[in-house]
Amino acid sequence: MVLEIRNISKNFGGISALTDVSFTINEGEIFGLIGPNGAGKTTMFNIITNMYAPTAGDIIFNGETITGTPPHKINQKGICRTFQNIKLFQQMTVLENVMVGRHSRSSAGVFRSVLRVPSQKREEEEMMMKAKELLSLVGLDSHIHMVAENLSYGQQRRLEIARALASDPKLLLLDEPAAGMNEKETDSLYDLIKEVQKRGITVLIIEHDMPLVMKLCDRITVLNFGKKLAEGTPEEIQNNDSVIEAYLGTEEEDVFA
């Protein structure tokens, strides 16, 4: 077991965003976290990465309680994420964006590397090789010198994944990675996430594209109004009446097709 979410609750004033939510993720899984808008999915990501402190409950990663651990140390322990809203360095090149992500695994600080301290030259070269490898993985190897803001939306999504992978995560959190993608880009994203899984990285994904989720995930937890509604395999979730009802009463074929 890589991650255990244990009885997590989160209140914002008098509003309960999450209430006593628990689930576990096994090593090597692609695990889906789904639910209608406002269900508490991104709040859960923010708690896992300690951008928010939980009101109650604990986060256990590889057997260690990490509740309250500073976000940069959570990253160093092997958890990295992407965001709903793309957070790239838009004026930096594609390669530079991934290099920044790689620095969390470097003994050299960003500023020492910028100053080109001689003792760090070899490490900097190794980091660049790793960054180029990841850009090849996500299909951006021909765009390494392009400024990030000039990439298409789908390409920026892939760059954000490459930057997250640069820190060598054991657990990768993807927050709506298919948002804004066309069908071809979504198919390519599926292949990319499957390749990430083959590399031994566990994936926790929030996604509203139900066909992608059902094809991609090994198991799924469904949240609704901050509470755990259901958990199971894609087949079990597709046949769960409570899940269908949670999606505003939409017919099953419309939700999952």
Across the structure, where does each feature detected by a protein language model lie?
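Glycine-rich phosphate-binding loops of nucleotide-dependent enzymes
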Residues: 2-257
